[in-house]
Amino acid sequence: MSAACISYFGGKKLKLTHSYAGKELKHWNQAAFISGIERLLGLYKPETTLKQMNMMTSHDTDRMLDTYGGDEKRLKLSVIFSFLFPGAINIYYGEELGLPGAFNAGTRQGMPWKNEKIWDKDLLGLYKRLAALRKGDEAIKHGKFEFLKEYCDGRALAFRRSSGGEALLCLMNNSSSEVNLALKQGALGNKPGAVLNSGVKLKPAGPKKLTAVLAPWAYAVYRL
């Protein structure tokens, strides 16, 4: 999962000083990313996937900030996808603070507990909100994952987690240009309300229709 996220969200900023499983990662377009994730989900039974550990980084990889070429906008999209993906997320210490570091030499330094000036408080806040959301939501912990391909246009990415009567829908814009998505009636529920939103606006587009306007690198999570 982490290799797929890096290949897709990294884009032209992708920067690695090592290989993953002996393979050099290259930029994936959206079609390749969706295909790769669906192939991964097809390898195991759903109940097995929910128990697997999703390691984003470790002491044997570059830190996320370096991997994404210092581009925090791309990093955040990858973090959100990883938190909402089935399985048990594993966060290497310091990633939530935006610590930099290349493989080996820069990934094993001590935690800067006493130097809060270098902490990225905005990124830390996002991690905290995602952790709280994940902890309290059955759809994320136990639900089905699916891409909403009618809203995946090469720039905008949409996916849903659902379990019983609970569901979450995530929209994100993995591009540097604004995206307008025409949403079907009821796509975001009867009373759309985002539990997480940065740069997504909903506009009426006729009787019971909405247009989601996604700013560059925007994201939003809606409880359905």
Spans of model-derived segments:
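Active-site-proximal helices and loops of the catalytic beta/alpha 8
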Residues: M1-Y44, F81, P100-R129, L133, ...
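Acidic/polar loop patches that form or flank catalytic/metal-binding clefts of enzymes
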Residues: I89-Y93, E138-E146
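C-terminal beta-strand-rich structural cap/linker in extracellular carbohydrate-active enzymes
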Residues: A205-L224
